[in-house]
Every structure is written in structure tokens, then in C-alpha cells.
Amino acid sequence: MNQLQQLQNPGESPPVHPFVAPLSYLLGTWRGQGEGEYPTIPSFRYGEEIRFSHSGKPVIAYTQKTWKLESGAPMHAESGYFRPRPDGSIEVVIAQSTGLVEVQKGTYNVDEQSIKLKSDLVGNASKVKEISREFELVDGKLSYVVRMSTTTNPLQPHLKAILDKL
């Protein structure tokens, strides 16, 4: 489908780009619950929704939002792009609602349906030094773990969640 056809038929999705195809299982909306911890804060639980979408280009758009389970009040949001390559490498850029930005690089494994990322750059963050993310599809559920290091704490688990596809 060319750009003119897409403009004329905006409800139709373009074909998935070949670079995106190995990760097409991510496409759609996922919702569930997660929990967070870190030595400097009290543990917490949250609701979460992640959406992965595509435009026919070699990139996956990513949006995420979280909320307090008790009240539904918004907590955190971020958005960005996943750029998979045919060799199994992937680059991810994320902008968080806190102003922090991440450039992550890593790999994806088609057979294991997993993605492993490590920060190449963490910007606009005086205390955060490194962030890693691991995503995995198990029994139709998307799980992830986010690890973080700061100026005072080594890399360790910070967030984890299990999400169901809607």
C-alpha cells in the first residue's frame, strides 16, 4: 500500500515491514499489572498498558502508561520507537514523562520471542546511570523486567510486569 492509498484508506493497516515481521507478535495493546522496588523508595504496584504499532516502515512505535491500582490516578508514561534489524540487533529510543531519555541497544531472539536491551545513553538524568530492559513472550503473556543503576546503587531490578494482549 503506497502513501496515497494509505491517506485514502486511513482505517487500513499497511503491510508489516520485513524488519518488523519477526517482532510482529508485539503489535497491539497489552494490559496488566506490575510492581516496582528500589533501595531508595517503598515498593509499589501499578496498572499498565503498552501499545506497539507500525506504519509499514522498519520501526515499531511504542507507548506506555501506568496508573495507581487503588485510585486509577496516572503515574508514569513513556513513548518511543523500536528499530529491529534483520541480523537480530535492535535499537530503541524512549522519552519518559519525567524528562529522562534513553537510547538502548540489544538483541532479539525470534525463537525465544525475547528482547534484551542495555542503555547506550541515558540523558537528562542526574542520578540514573544505566537502564536495561528485557521483554519475553511466555504462554501468550508479555513480561518484562527493567533494571536500573544510579549514582548510589548498582544495576538491579526496579520494575516488572506481566501483561495480557487485548
From Swiss-Prot:
Subunit field text: Homodimer.
Domain of life: Eukaryota
CDD domains according to UniProt: lipocalin_heme-bd-THAP4-like
Family label: Belongs to the nitrobindin family.
Motif interval(s): GXWXGXG: 28-34
Enzyme class per UniProt: isomerase
GO cellular component terms attached to this protein's record: cytosol
The protein's annotated pathway: Nitrogen metabolism
Major localization class: cytoplasm
Protein name, UniProt field: Peroxynitrite isomerase Rv2717c
Task of the protein: Heme-binding protein able to scavenge peroxynitrite and to protect free L-tyrosine against peroxynitrite-mediated nitration, by acting as a peroxynitrite isomerase that converts peroxynitrite to nitrate. Therefore, this protein likely plays a role in peroxynitrite sensing and in the detoxification of reactive nitrogen and oxygen species (RNS and ROS, respectively). Is able to bind nitric oxide (NO) in vitro, but may act as a sensor of peroxynitrite levels in vivo.
UniProt catalytic activity: peroxynitrite = nitrate
PANTHER family: PEROXYNITRITE ISOMERASE THAP4, THAP4 PROTEIN
Cofactors (names): heme b
InterPro entries xrefs: Calycin, Nitrobindin, THAP4-like_heme-bd
Species for this entry: Arabidopsis thaliana
Record: residues binding heme b: 40, 158
Enzyme Commission identifier(s): 5.99.-.-
Coiled coil: none
Compartments where located: Cytoplasm
Binding note for cofactor: Binds 1 heme b group per subunit, that coordinates a highly solvent-exposed Fe(III) atom.
Record's keyword terms, sorted: Cytoplasm, Heme, Iron, Isomerase, Metal-binding
One Pfam family in the UniProt entry: THAP4_heme-bd
UniProt KW Heme keyword: yes
